[in-house]
Amino acid sequence: MKLRLQGNSVRLRLTRSEVERLLDTGLVEESVDFGAGEVLAYRLHSGLEPGPVQAVFRQGSVTVSVSTEDAQAWAGTDEVGIYTQSGVLAISIEKDFRCLTRPLNRQEPDAYPHPGQPSETRL
């Protein structure tokens, strides 16, 4: 799972296996160890009752929560992502697509086929 922070926005990008793990277990998490005991953890949690996507930051950890219903609906379609605004914070949860400019032999095999890529060049 990739995390992108820019201004007042949080974006999570998930590969196919991470989306499946979210549906199966309700949790996908990663961390970055900066050394000296400083770790940034980030996670996507599903299982909330129906309602808006939420994000919280506590004790060096970013947690984005989405309802199971919304996660299942998104995962089962061609929709790229779930997008919401929570106060001043924009939250995006997206499927991670293959890069259009990276050589095919260097693609991430678990990424989703890019919708802008001709079907004969999709892996």
Across the structure, where does each feature detected by a protein language model lie?
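Compositionally biased, non-globular sequence tracts
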Residues: 1-4, 9, 13-123
